[in-house]
Swiss-Prot record:
Top enzyme category: isomerase
Highest taxon of source: Bacteria
Lineage: Bacteria, Bacillati, Actinomycetota, Actinomycetes, Mycobacteriales
One Gene Ontology term from the biological process aspect of the record: protoporphyrinogen IX biosynthetic process
Record flagged with keyword Isomerase: yes
CDD domains reported in the protein's UniProt record: OAT_like
GO molecular function, one term: transaminase activity
Keywords: Cytoplasm, Isomerase, Porphyrin biosynthesis, Pyridoxal phosphate
Subunit comment: Homodimer.
Cofactor(s) listed in the protein's UniProt record: pyridoxal 5'-phosphate
Protein name as it appears in the record: Glutamate-1-semialdehyde 2,1-aminomutase
Amino acid sequence: MTVSSGDPDVHASRSAQLFERADLVIPGGVNSPVRAFHSVGGTPRFIKEASGYTLTDVDGNDYVDLICSWGPMILGHAHPAVVEAVQKAAATGLSFGAPTEGEIELAEEIVGRVAPVEKVRLVNSGTEATMSAVRLARGFTGRTKVLKFSGCYHGHVDALLADAGSGLATFGLPTSPGVTGAQAEDTIVVPYNDLDAVAQAFAANEGRIACVITEAAAGNMGAVAPQPGFNEGLRKLTSDNGALLIMDEVMTGFRVSSAGWFGLDGVAGDLYTFGKVMSGGLPAAAFGGRADVMAHLAPAGPVYQAGTLSGNPVAVAAGLASLRAADQGVYDALERNSATLRTLLSDALTAESVPHRVQTAGTMLSVFFSEDPVTNYAEAKAAQTWRFPAFFHGLLSRGVYPPPSAFEAWFVSAAMDDRAFSIIADALPHAAKAAAAAVQP
């Protein structure tokens, strides 16, 4: 494997050695593509441990974590309440293949927070949640077509990979080989934040669209919030046309508020998908919604879905502990920390006259190297993304770990304190200078 010469000391590092070793037995050396640093160059850091806001790699380097495991760690890493819950659950058994009381408690916690969700099914990943929600929408409506938005990522479900964000955006791929033409034909893709395009799609496919699936606020083309009235417009268009509205809150759920994005705009979906925060950092996710729709799910109804490890007791314990520890003080801290980071980023880039927009979607944020606001995927791709690798490494080399992609949201945790922001503030001038000096290829 070739290691980027722009990554200093990499040939001598333990991370580099592990990356070489991993590449022999793991495709690309990683188990999720964005971790490979392909879009920013250099060698991925292999992490040994984490605590609070700090990641420590196998070479002993510490980083302020602005990835938070891609969203779940709102409390910070190794939070005592979550660790204790996991240890206690693991001591009584790792998996039973039978129901537990904890599953009911986690479902009750979700239903109690998000009013439109009346029943919930636990699964193992956000991909499983969106796949199952779409299948249920098709089964409930008797229709086949799904409408999604360019740049919105809903996991690696075949039907939902068309023009998706996240890793596909990072690698510049419109879709994935292996997705059949028949699957693609049932997926309608329109620009995000464009209600006219949605209305036209319904008119052109009258009586055939089962559901519209949208990120409640986009985080996989960077942080792009819905424009005022957009989610409300989706609610009306789906209702008027007999389709279901699936709100994908895998990223926003229980991060942007205790009730997710629903807690911010109050727009009710028919189905919801959750993951990340509700997992406490372990493999767990969920989908849920209206009771009459969920009644079509097996064993109550004919739409099949199952999972050997769904509702795993250790993952359930982590999720419950994380949600219960996330009191209003945690959400207030997330708001403050997101606002502070946004100001630091903008001030540093402004000082170097770098064109930029630091955009937020709730407490998620991202940096676009653009003079203009970004409201959709086309505008995100039109930004000067070639500046991002230099900016990224300027931060990483000084102890700050942002997402290794221009198209991923940045995340803060409630564990961040003055010292964390001091490290970020010290690193940003160098990173901003590097972004300013970057040359378009």
